[in-house]
Structures are given as C-alpha cells and as structure tokens.
Amino acid sequence: MSLPKGLKNYVIITKTPLRITFGGGGSDMASYYLRYPSTCISATINKYVYVLVRKRFDDKIYLKYSDNEVVDIQHIDDIQHDFIRETLKFMNVSYGIEIINWADIPTRGTGLGSSSSFLVGLLLALHTLEGRYVSKEALAAQACYIEIDKCKKPIGIQDQYAAAFGGFNQMEFGSNIRKGDYKEISGFGFCDQEIRNISEHLHLFYTGVTRESKDILSAQKENLISDQEIVSNMHKNVEIANKLAECLTHKDISSIPITLRQNWELKKKFAGDISNPELDRIYDVATTIGGAEAGKILGAGGGGFFLFWANDKKKLKEALADYQELPFLIDKYGTRVVLNLEQLSW
C-alpha cells in the first residue's frame, strides 16, 4: 500500500503537559474576552498526556484510550470519541491509523486541563506524521476550534495555549479595533532556581471527587452573558491577575498566595456548584491546621485537585493525610514530539 503524499511511515509519540492556574480563569471564555480584556496566569507541570499515532497497513482506525474502538476509515463519523473524530475530520485523514492515549495520572474531571492537552498532543502527532511543521500558536488555535466550535464544549481558551506553549505565562485575550481578536502569550523569565523555589511552595492534593465540568462551565458561560454581578466579579478577577503578572514580572512571588486566596473567593461566585461543604472543609483544614497560606480548586470546580501555597510541606501533608498528594515541578516546555521512529516497510 502506497502512502499518501507527505505521510511518513513512522511511529510518532507526543508528550503534552497538564497545567495549574493562578488567576484570571473564566475570563478566557468568549462570552467575556470578546467584550472585555482578559488575563490568565498559568504554569504547566511535569505531569503529561501522551499520544501515539502510526499509519496502519489497512483502512481501519484503531483507537485505544479509556475505551477501545475500531472503525472503517469510510465511517469516520461512527467514532464515539468526539475529540478524535473531529480532529481526524479536520485533518482530512483518509488512511488507516492507530491512535493510543495514556497519561501520568487519571485525567477525567481533575481540573488540570487534560482534555485540551490531549487535543494539542493529538494535533501535533498527526501534523508530524504527515511531515508538516506547525507552530505552537497554530496548534493552540486549531485545538480551540475543534474543542469549542466543533465539539461544542463550553470552555475557555487558556488551556489549549498553555498546553502548546508550556512554561509559566501570562496570557492575554481580547478583541478591539486596533488588534482584532488577539491572543498574546508572555513568560516571566524565571531562571531554573526561581522556578524550583516557586514549585517548592506549591502543593497539589486530590479531593477524590471527579466531576463533569460541562454543567458548571455552561452555567458560568450563561452568567457571563446575563448576570452583571458575575461580570463585575470577573472584572475583579482579571484585575487581580494583572496585579499578579506585574509582581511576577519583578520576580515578586509573595503575591502568589494572595492571588490564590482572592481568586478562590471570587471563583465560588461564578456558578453554584464550584464549591461544596466538603471542598470548603478541605480548604479550612489546609489553611488552619495545615498552615497553608492560601489555595484554590483547579479547573471548573466541584472536585478534582486543590492547589495550595505552603511553606511547611510536612505539616500540610499531615493535615491532609486522607487525601492523595501529587508531587510536581513546573515544566518549562509545551507539547513536543518525544519519539519519531520509522517503521519497517510493508
């Protein structure tokens, strides 16, 4: 079987980081940033989503993720995994292919941006398989298009840009006459030692609760359109993120716990299910008994991972002994190809 023009007879594996957020989350939804300037602060971490793709000898699509699927290439619309289905259609894939996905941690409902990381990694793998260079900005934009426009997910756009670019960044999104719709990504220029210092203060704990972000984000999306009080709170959220960005530009990390605390209090007002009594209890235990200066739930809310800022890791771990800690470091890089191996000819 001859390969389509440009298609490599290779095995490709991509590695794409998950992310944590510090401020501005929610302002990256189109219902906000197309009307008002948005700022988000996030960092990628050394926990990854992996995607393997390879050309098959036949005309079938083999998928292995938390489920398995086998579909004829002529029946691509029968694929149940919406991200894979829409990505293959977007890329005009017309050949048999195998796609395998795995991750360092369970990713569903954790609040670490795993769905966007998977999508960015899948796009990079397919572009590489077809011998095509694609920029980080293009990867992020394509992932946003597939996830939001094609798969109709009620989400923002910071996760896709974080996964593509990697590092500790300020992301600004907006729309105006001078720039049109714009996305600007800028790092803070931290050296390795400064990154390690920040990482040593940050601690992730799993609440044991997974949730579908769709309902929470749908409510938040509607609130940003119809509820002026929510819009006003989002303005405050962006203002807090901008202040943090200014401090981080001057290497002042003391503002991080202040931002986490302020962000968590505002975040709980954006939709009804973002927090609950159990999450409030975890936060209280961490900040009173565990000595954490501040913290926030990551992602849409309702469960997943708490991010805490604390000086005494041992004290915090003892206070939250009933919850699983996820040790991590900040990752400086975005999605990348980690294996590009030529297969034997058929």
Role assignments for model-derived ranges:
Residues 99-111:
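N-terminal pre-triad scaffold of radical SAM enzymes
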Residues 303:
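Glycine-rich active-site/cofactor-binding loop and its immediate structural neighborhood
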Residues 111-136, 164:
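DPxDG-like acidic metal-binding loop motif
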Residues 123, 306-307:
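Short hydrophobic alpha-helical segments that form membrane-spanning helices or hydrophobic packing faces
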Residues 96-97, 134-138:
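Short, surface-exposed acidic
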Residues 1-23, 28-34, 40-42, 48-95, ...:
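C-terminal nucleotide
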